[in-house]
Every structure is written in C-alpha cells, then in structure tokens.
Amino acid sequence: KMPAFEWVHVQLHQQKGMISLSPPTICNSAIASGSGWDGLKTLVAMATRLTATMADDPLNHVLDGYHRFRRYAPRMLRLLDLRAAPVALPLLEAVTALRTGLNDAAMTSFLRPSSKWHRHLRAQRAGDARLWEIAVLFHLRDAFRSGDVWLTRSRRYGDLKHALVPAQAIAEGGRLAVPLRPEEWLADRQARLDMRLRELGRAARAGTIPGGSIENGVLHIEKLEAAAPTGAEDLVLDLYKQIPPTRITDLLLEVDAATGFTEAFTHLRTGAPCADRIGLMNVILAEGINLGLRKMADATNTHTFWELIRIGRWHVEGEAYDRALAMVVEAQAALPMARFWGMGTSASSDGQFFVATEQGEAMNLVNAKYGNTPGLKAYSHVSDQYAPFATQVIPATASEAPYILDGLLMNDAGRHIREQFTDTGGFTDHVFAACAILGYRFAPRIRDLPSKRLYAFNPSAAPAHLRALIGGKVNQAMIERNWPDILRIAATIAAGTVAPSQILRKLASYPRQNELATALREVGRVERTLFMIDWILDAELQRRAQIGLNKGEAHHALKRAISFHRRGEIRDRSAEGQHYRIAGMNLLAAIIIFWNTMKLGEVVANQKRDGKLLSPDLLAHVSPLGWEHINLTGEYRWPKP
C-alpha cells in the first residue's frame, strides 16, 4: 500500500484540484506500473511549481527576459521614425529618453494611474532602470497595436486615418449598404430592433421558439440534428461507383483542357503563359500534394529538379495562384451539377491547422488547442457549391474573425457572396458591423449563444420576458459622432486599398480602445442583436448555417488527403514558401472538386437519358469532395508530347 505520508500528500494536492486519484488500494498498482511513485512525486513537484508561477503576477518575471530587450531595443528605437497621437505623447517622450540613453525611471506619466507597473517600479533599487525600460517597450507595443503611435511610411503600422479613403469618396464608391446620414440608420435600426424584440417576447410567452425557450430570464436552445434524407448516402455511393478511377496526372490534363487554368501562370518578365504545361503542372502538383520539387523530379518521367526550379521561379507566384483558382471556381459554378448545391451566393469560412517545422518564420506558433507542436492555419472560404474560392495563411494563435472579409473582398468570387457562415472563432462585434455596412449577411454559429447579451436602444421598454437578456443600451451619440469615420473604414475595406484584416486587427488590438473602435463595436452590437433574434426564431437559418459549415469541414478532409506527403507537415521555412504550399494545396483541391462535379453531372445526365430521374433533394446531399477513386500516389507519369 501507499505509505501514509504519501497518501496525505496526494490528498492535499487532490484538494487543490491538481490531481484526482482513487483510494490507495485501487490506484497503487496503476501508478506503480506507470511512472512509479518516484515519477509521480517528481510530476507533482513540477505541477506545484508551474501552478505557483501561473498564479503569480506576470510582472514579477519580466526581468528574466531583459537581456533579449537590450539586444535589439536601442538600435530599433534609433531607426524608427515614430509619431504619436496626443494621448501617447508622454510615451513618446519616454521612448526618446530610452533612445538617447537617458533612462529615467521617474518618467512614468505614460502609465495609467491604476497600472500595476507603478507598484513594481517603486520596488526597484535606486538607479536600476531595467524594469522601466521594459515598461516603455511594452506600452510602445500596445500603442502600435491601438494606433496611438504609428510609423511614417509604414503600411502595417502607419496612421490608420491616413490610410482611409477621403470622406468625399464614400458616396462615389457605391459599395455601402447603409445611409450616409447616421440619423437614418439609427431610426431604421431602432424601429427594426424594437419590432424584433416584441416578436421574440411574444414567442417566449407563447412557447413557440423553435427548439428552445426563455424561462426565468435564461435562454435555452437545442442543437439541430442532422437532417439528411433517407437514401442520400446510398445515392452518393452509387454515383461515385460509376466514376472511373483516374490518375491525378490525367485529371489535371483534363481540367486544364476544360478551364485553361495553366494560362494564369505567366512569365514574371514577359507576361507570356508558360509554354511547358506539363512542367508547370508538375510544379503545381508538387506543391499541392506537399511533395516538394526535388522528390517530384524523382517521381515524374518528364522533368529534372533544375527544370522544375526554373519553371517555379519564373511562373509560379501568389497572384498566379489566385488567377488560376478564380478560373477553376468560375468554371465549376457554370456546371449544371453545381446548381443542385447552391447558387454561389453563400459561403462558410474556417481555419485548418497544419503542423509546421520548428525552424520556420513567425507564422509557426504553438496553439495549445492543437497540442505542443508549432504550426500555422490555412483560413479558407468555401462556397455553397463546394468551391474553395479563397485561402490565406494565418498564425496558429491568431483570431480568425478579422480574416473573414479578406476572402470575400479580395477576389471576384467572394463579391458574389451575400450570406457568410462561420464558427464561433470567426465572430466579433466589429465583424458584424463591417459585414452589415458592406451588405453581407453575417451568420456565425455561436457556441455559447445563451450567454451572449442582447442590446436595445431603450432597455426599459423591452418585453418583460427579455429584460434579463438585455446587456446594455446602445450608445447612439457615439455612433453619430463617429459615423463619417465608420463609413470611411467600410469604404476603405470595400476599395481594397488596405486588407480588411489589417484594419480590424488594429481596431480590436488594445484593451483601452479608441472611440472609433468603440463606436464600430456599438454598431456591431445592434447587428448582432438582430442576428441573434433571427437565429432564435428561425430554424431554417440555423439549418442553412449548419449545412454551410459542414461543407467547409468536409473540405478539410479533402485537403488532408491530398497533402499526405511529409506526414502532412508544412516544412517550408519562409512565409512565402508556406503561402505557396497552402495555395497549391487549395488549387489542387479546387481542381479535384471541378473534375468530380463534371463527372457526377455526366453520370446524372446519363441516368436521366436512361429514364431514371433522381430527386433534386437527394442530389443536394451529394458532395464533390470524394478522392478514393483518384490515384494520388506512386509515380507521376505524363503522356509524351
């Protein structure tokens, strides 16, 4: 049995919530056969130290990294041409002192009165300015993020308002879906919100909320169950059985003959399309299946490594991938079979994690959600016709929300979308506001919807059943004051002069948000409240969102299947290489989806000619994401020219 002192030790840690064990007679053999008691005591001691560190004030440990700050900070500050808003002028004075070596720990006017830094700075020895230097750099970082400090001639860290389109260009753009006068927008939204709150109140009293209820001020809503009709799965299997097996090389040739996507890869100097189509498709295939050019040269019967390198350097770049993808997506949308799945006016977006090499650039970060291995995310937009019309590489730890509008506005396919679905990770009030102003119906599946608060223009006038759900009052005055700049933000996003994610990240970056960011959040709260009421009362909206998100998640499985080489890891060490790898993977997925859509359509047409009519309701559940009939492995042989 476990010695008494050890059992007491385990019980004490169990009370702290650190471990949970059965009585000694049960757990003794399990521990002995595992790490052993010595190993357990080591793990408990390590957990105790980690718990104490995590519970401690982080500022007690920042001096441990002081040497890293000193390695780059003085040179960096000498090179940067900084500008600041009035609120950040005290910080700029402290930066100037640090830059010139006049480190004065008494210069603390840049700190907020309630800042924890004051207590830690007072505890430092006289003449020790190390913690003060770190405080200046931390606050400089936050000021960059909030836009209170900016760099001249910088696109990412420049003055946000200088990057926005001028006010007179708003009316000329014609892309905004809201009135130019804030009074009109506020009057419309107040009338609409009051009406929808009354409708929700009546449904709550009558008990007619679909799959949900509001009881004692608490919202309850059930998750929709899958609603695939009987026979859909059998139909999918039957249709795919009639598609002949094919090699990926033959598939690429057939899709290029139908779409001409290789024409998009023009010479960087002359602008002429690549004359060596087979070589170009070898390069695209090497990126798409995550094989790499050197191993592709060993696996193909047509080109050497140096020939593939030459083609890749002169013809393959990001814009070429975007053009080729647009050609394939447009061609797939024109196929008759695609109409059974949708009209190309709704889409879903989601991030997919890929393990990356330890020695890459800044994209390779550890996100505990995916384990302890560094990686990156491919954030993709998939239309209701299954076409992956946009993808981009983002850090594994980044919020997905700011990138939603990038995929919708940075290419033509996204501009046809009217309703955008996403999961909880893609939702913020800023995104709700920007999507509504630009005319998109933003419909996220919010995991903890019952805990989210509604907002009203007049909370006291809300139905009694709903008052416990009201989180606050909409600040109309703040919206009115900032309406011109809100429209400038939206017009700038629509014009494509600045990436939407760049603007939204900056607005959301700082805890003490500036008034413009807060005003945009107020607009988003109004739009989110309207959406939440729609979601609660409309089971069909919930079902559409579920179907859209399922299409995106199924698309992830196809990408996993085609990127099987190198264990699915993205081992490129540069951000550019990672981008090309993900872009190649997305293009190859789109090519397979086009080919499957074409072949499924041919099978359906043949059955129709034979007098066998298939139900459109069943065909809507057929997916072009199958790959079992495609030979992705082995040697990649092409017909001789």
Tell what function each PLM region has.
Residues V328-L365:
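Structured nucleic-acid-interacting core domains from mobile-element enzymes and related host factors
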Residues M2-I31:
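Aspartic protease catalytic domain
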Residues A32-Q190:
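Long amphipathic alpha-helical coiled-coil/heptad-repeat bundle
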Residues D298-P336, V366-P484:
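Catalytic or ion-translocation cores adjacent to nucleophile or general acid/base/metal-coordination motifs
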Residues A461, A468-P641:
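Long, compositionally biased intrinsically disordered regions
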Residues D194-A299:
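Structured, charged N-terminal subsegments at the starts of enzyme catalytic cores
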Residues A32-S33, D38-A52, L63, H67, ...:
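A conserved ligand/cofactor-binding region detector
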Residues A32-A45, A52-H61, E263-E330:
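Short, positively charged, Gly/Tyr-enriched micro-motifs
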